[in-house]
Amino acid sequence: MAILPLFQQSWQELYKITFTPLLPLLFLFSFLYVFKCIKSSGKPNLPPSPPKLPIIGNLHQLGSLPHRSFQALSKKYGPVMFFYFGHAPTLVVSSADMAREMMKTHDIVFSNRPKATATNSLLYGCTDIAFSSYGEYWRQVRKICVLELLSLKRVQSFQYTREEEVSILINKVRDLCLKGVSINLSELLIENSNNIVTRCVFGKKFGQVDGKGKSSELPRKVMVLLAAFFWEDFFPFLGWIDMLTGFKPSLKSTCGELDAFLDQVVEEHKTMKREDEHPNKKDFADILLQLQKDGMLDFELSHDNLKAILLDMFVGGSDTTSTTLEWVMAELIRNPSIMKRAQEEVRRVVGNKSKIDVNDINQMDYLKCILKESLRLHPPVPLSVPRETSESLKFGGYDIPPKTRVFVNVWAIQRDPKLWDRPEEFIPERFTNNPVDFIGQNFEFIPFGGGRRGCPGLTFGIAVVEYVLANLLCWFDWRLPSINAKGEDLDMTEVNAITAFRKNPLCLVPILHSS
């Protein structure tokens, strides 16, 4: 309001000026000022953004580990940041409050998935569960997943499979103990996780599925490709560069491997007569084929749809499980006093028994705290699977355009000093008598996501991880290969993929525990 008197005073002074040519100039400047105000008032109020470069936008700020780069940028630009990666508008959320607003208040608007070169090729036009567009098809396939494939009852039905495969793992480690040599624990954990998952999904172990053992390489190949930078996604006119980088040929080759692999699995299941089997003994492929055959679904489940869903179970279940186990064992090596306390708990609960059962796991409270703390520091997917806004909205006081890609920086939220005391330290006790859990309701701790797009395989994965971890701690002591090495010196560098697995394999010396 104070501007108006000043303007009136200036206007009266003009009449005293004899040099009248100044008047048109004043009107011109006034017009330009008003035009600028009108134009600026029509601009959307976008979130803060780091300076971008012509054409590439903010791509140069991604770094080799985007979750770490985004965390550093959020300290300057705040918990809601806006980027342009090529032509693609992108939102990055780095606080629990904003994650809550996104996944609760505006969950539907944020529930879509962007189409990308890798997901479209690998997942049969994004007709799986994780990357399919939000809508009726996604609701139906998620319903199948939750009720038929990953229900608590179904997960419990695979307990025998978990026990048998873990027993094989323990026997392998026990045999290696006699040699007193270092073992590649990462390799053994990957093999074990893969065997458990493929038996549940396909009814066979990894090497038995294709007869060559090549399938064991596929999960991490897929995870790396899903996180790879394809020029086509950000600069459609530069898609040819993907041929030069090698990503496009690698994508084509991997898609061919996957398709042949899945076709073989599905055809084998179709020719096998398993109708007489008990429902709880059937694997995921059996269940999906039965649903397809009986016409019990509200939509047509095509051959490609079926393969896409199986691929989700196969790749997602295998890689996230082994990655989680690698990180928790690495943290225990770095924190020997915590490992000792965990071993004492596990061995006390198991007692003189020769085998750990599921009821024992339920009594291992400290082990569960250790797993939570490891998931806090090392979420399997540090930068959430991207979402996409289905329409424009107000979010955190900002204007967010439709078709904006959205990432939640889970890694940054779970290391936020405003939420966690000594956030960079491994302190399992922080979860003792603490109701905070990883089911997606506490947004300071969302290693498996939250809202409609939260991970449906959480129960399955946790059951495997807890059982494997309890066995590794019960029957063995562990140390680094070098006698003089300190746990704190263990390299903890991660690799950029959809799942952030260790850059270097975890090699340890197992020592058979004598009770």
Residue ranges and their predicted role:
Residues 59-78, 257-260, 357-397, 417, ...:
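Conserved cytochrome P450 K-helix E-x-x-R motif and the immediately C-terminal K′/meander segment
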